[in-house]
Amino acid sequence: MTDYKATLNLPDTAFPMKAGLPQREPQILQRWDSIGLYGKLREIGKDRPKFVLHDGPPYANGKIHIGHALNKILKDMIVRSKTLSGFDAPYVPGWDCHGLPIEHKVEVTHGKHLTADRTRELCREYAAEQIEGQKTEFIRLGVLGDWDNPYKTMNFANEAGEIRALAEMVKQGFVFKGLKPVNWCFDCGSALAEAEVEYADKKSQTIDVAFPVADADKLAAAFGLSALAKPAAIVIWTTTPWTIPANQALNIHPDFKYALVDTGERLLVLAEELVESCLKRYNLEGSVIATAQGSALELINFRHPFYDRLSPIYLAEYVELGAGTGVVHSSPAYGEDDFVTCKRYGMVNEDILTPVQSNGVYVESLPFFGGQFIWKANPAIVDKLSEVGALMHTETISHSYMHCWRHKTPLIYRATAQWFVGMDKQPSTGEPLRERALKAIEETKFVPAWGQARLHSMIANRPDWCISRQRNWGVPIPFFLDKQTGELHPRTVELMEEVAKRVEQEGIEAWFKLDAQELLGDEAGQYDKITDTLDVWFDSGTTHWHVLRGSHDIGHATGPRADLYLEGSDQHRGWFHSSLLTGCAIDGHAPYRELLTHGFTVDENGRKMSKSLGNTIEPQKVNDTLGADILRLWVSATDYSGEMAVSEQILQRSADAYRRIRNTARFLLSNLSGFDPARDLLPAEDMLALDRWAVDRTLLLQRELEEHYSEYRFWNVYSKVHNFCVQELGGFYLDIIKDRQYTTGANSVARRSCQTALYHISEALVRWIAPILAFTADEIWQYLPGERNESVMLNTWYEGLSELPADAELDRAYWDRVMAVKAAVNKELENQRTAKVIGGNLQAEVTLFAEEGLTADLNKLGDELRFVLITSAASVVPFVQAPADAVTTEVEGLKLKVVKSGHAKCGRCWHFRADVGSHPEHPEICGRCVDNLNGSGEVRHYA
């Protein structure tokens, strides 16, 4: 018996079936490094249009988590897809290095006794060490970038650039010194940015406090009375008893109605709408004897409950009727609205009472409560109010309250002398900053679109930006202030440039060790050199200045504006926000053209990731068990516009999908064995109809994928590539071509046509997956036939695909109908296999009973219809001849019948044919196989 296996063109490739990604990926990384892949990309991109995705810097502290991995992979997929789209897309990774968390780490490790200089030195060392660890982890994810030369906000050039950015804003008149309430953390001993504030539930003691009237005659007149018959008081409600010692005014709404209520012993002023609820709370009975519009009570004085001073009525529209009494007590040092209202009524900074120190303790000189920590003083204040007869009611409530993101402790608003960027301050030229920023938001593209309204709302309502901090590890605010007037030195901008030059050489230490005389000469004695540092959001918020046109000048043809900023949705109040403000202040426009926001990771049940819940996914562990490409595939498959679910089970599903894509690639490569495109590639017009369709289908899909990539819709890319591999290729085309690929002559047109199609598909597919499966695509690239450069990334989307001619007889619609027929036949073949009627599809002979139009279509394939259906015989009969036992299908106008072939099985192609054994020299094989072995070979036209 002859062994015909050796006569077949069996698939062969060294491309491994088992990916072994955890072991293979580090080897691929080494190869990228050894060939200098990133440098080569910059070289080939010199004459291309530029696309700049500017990296929002992660904080240089700790190991990377799944959110970091998600963010960097998304960025890498964009950079890679833009590169393949013909752009020069540099990617410079960066790190945020200054700020309290690092300073806090150093204090915990080394103690709080350190000098400021030593603190900065240790902070710099710590940040550098953290960056190296994170860098290794980011590279392991397959992220292509300038890792040898990243930007760091602590690099001397960047620190100097930040000072220059501040100088620009000073020059344009945006920066001012002011006493304003800012978010203050006692543990940090510093002001906090809006982005450093989080909200959590807090138990607070609420109090209703009566302030006795001082201007009794005015109060009577306001209510239309000739005199007050009894003592009178106005009642406030607050959740912050500790602010009562700093009370300086009372706020009511000008448009609300206020009532004078007789409660027997005294008269109370309350909002008319709240009289009933207040009396019930105070366990009092009373009647309204008069009402007045809020505006009528303006500037009437009341007395502080336990200090000898007056509290006038100021009108304020922020007062609400949702809770309390309709009267708000005002401590301008400890509330934003309080401060604004008191300033509007002419209160000067020097008159604002600030009894709470930076550590949360009242100054010693404060009567009754000096030296007490404010939270602990609350009961004493309540007791004092009760003692003087001012306490109407007290209870404890739980409410959402602002906390420090780092220490998780409650914050307060605290008025301190700080440096601000004014939102509504008129600059030297152009519109105020708020106006510029709101206009810039309208000019920016947002993905998803809802981000625009969110950022607009934040900018429209935000206060002035407090940019100063009282910390050691930060870029200095290099100002000299006149000791007499407190004003900036008249040559401030010029002096800042001198400081920047020194910082460029020595880092921020240059400012802190600078002798003022060195810059000011004889004037030095007249000025104070300040020690405040900049908010870290100013560090990262000015990277468009000190990175994109500084340390890593991108040379963008349309200026230093980045094409894209991409971060998590929390950055609407963080990096997107601070960058927008500095960009609009310095340049008059946003530093980005487009903002892309991704959601946060949650587990499969939608719960937030947390170590206490045990539901965290560590990217390092995924790399070591499944491989980074699996993590990348998960990122691509998930719609990032909302929360992104990830778990071990979800990643396992990604691994299953990966195997299907890898197996498809392996099938393609193994069937290109012996194929040399320079020698064997057929022109489109010489290819078989099915092969031309496969290439055309690939071209159509490539057009869709290019559009999805350009819109950053990676989940669409993933689903369409996966479906293409599983359905159009695996479920249709690749199954059909096996017979032709294996059994026809090695150099026959039938086989070379098929290999030409497989080659085109492979060249396209390897590029499609390159932005997502970065490692696997480059691995496939090494196994593809023909001469090629060192990496798939050194190319653009494949241009060798051809379209079906417009007049093709077997057009796209034709093959869609054939696919539907094949699906119907497959369904019945499966039924027959399950019923044990046939052992395999090739043991079947199928008769198709078709309506006239479908009959004509199917007959176009002639005898090759059986190869498409992968049966040993296929015939088409008019629909009306269908017997009663013919199976009705989902295809309109089609019934079919499958029977087991009564013929012998060919020992070479495994088809069951009547002519098996008809050739005496080859008694075990069919006539077609004999012709393929010894004759001119079978001729195929279609499939």
Swiss-Prot record:
Localization of this protein: Cytoplasm
Binding-site residues for L-isoleucyl-5'-AMP, renumbered to this chain: E567
Cofactors named for this entry: Zn(2+)
Gene3D superfamilies on file: 1.10.730.20, HUPs (3.40.50.620), Valyl/Leucyl/Isoleucyl-tRNA synthetase, editing domain (3.90.740.10)
Predominant location category: cytoplasm
Signal sequence annotation: none
A single GO cellular-component term on record: cytosol
Enzyme class: ligase
Binding site for ATP: K611
Catalytic activity as recorded in UniProt: tRNA(Ile) + L-isoleucine + ATP = L-isoleucyl-tRNA(Ile) + AMP + diphosphate
Keywords: Aminoacyl-tRNA synthetase, ATP-binding, Cytoplasm, Ligase, Metal-binding, Nucleotide-binding, Protein biosynthesis, Zinc
Motif range ('HIGH' region): 58-68
Residues annotated to bind Zn(2+): C906, C909, C926, C929
Cited PROSITE patterns: AA_TRNA_LIGASE_I (PS00178)
EC annotation from Swiss-Prot or TrEMBL: 6.1.1.5
Domain of life the protein comes from: Bacteria
Co-factor binding details: Binds 1 zinc ion per subunit.
GO molecular function, one term: zinc ion binding
HAMAP family attached to this UniProt entry: Ile_tRNA_synth_type1
Family, as annotated: Belongs to the class-I aminoacyl-tRNA synthetase family. IleS type 1 subfamily.
Subunit structure: Monomer.
Function: Catalyzes the attachment of isoleucine to tRNA(Ile). As IleRS can inadvertently accommodate and process structurally similar amino acids such as valine, to avoid such errors it has two additional distinct tRNA(Ile)-dependent editing activities. One activity is designated as 'pretransfer' editing and involves the hydrolysis of activated Val-AMP. The other activity is designated 'posttransfer' editing and involves deacylation of mischarged Val-tRNA(Ile).
Protein name, as recorded: Isoleucine--tRNA ligase
Species of the source: Pseudomonas entomophila (strain L48)
The encoding gene: ileS
